[in-house]
Amino acid sequence: MDWMRFLRGTPAGDYVYQEAPYEEQVRRAADLLDQADAVLIGAGAGLSAAAGLVYGGRRFTDNFSEFIGRYVPVAMRDMYAAGFYPFPTQEERWAYWSRHAYVNRIEPPALPLYLKVFGMMRKREHFVLTTNVDHQFWKAGFKDEDIFATQGDYGLIQCAKRSEER
């Protein structure tokens, strides 16, 4: 394999060789997990999206319609993009982020996918390393000492300055 060719964007078919069909790979992974002494769960936005916490589409328009109508619509295409919007005042910025935290962290119960993951790990040694800030691992039953949320938790969001300093 020529690494320079690889790094320049060679189509995957040129360098990926799959010895075993997908189903066999999944079965092998399941066997390895069954035999493991402990499991490290690495989770990012894809897990929460798969669980239903999507940042776009109807979930966004239903929960943020007043923001979409008031500000530049192209900047308000989903919750992620809207988080970077240069709101004219701190009150408007905090109104957005308060709604964002409510919709993604406070309001949702433990989602079935997270409950399923917890059910599989309940009696196993495990540790969770996540970039998710939606508190779903805790809601599903994982213990605080078994979770490292590298980007924090929406439930802990606060202004960097006290009110009397603003």
Predicted segments with their positions:
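Conserved catalytic core of sirtuin-type NAD+-dependent deacylases
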Residues: 1-165
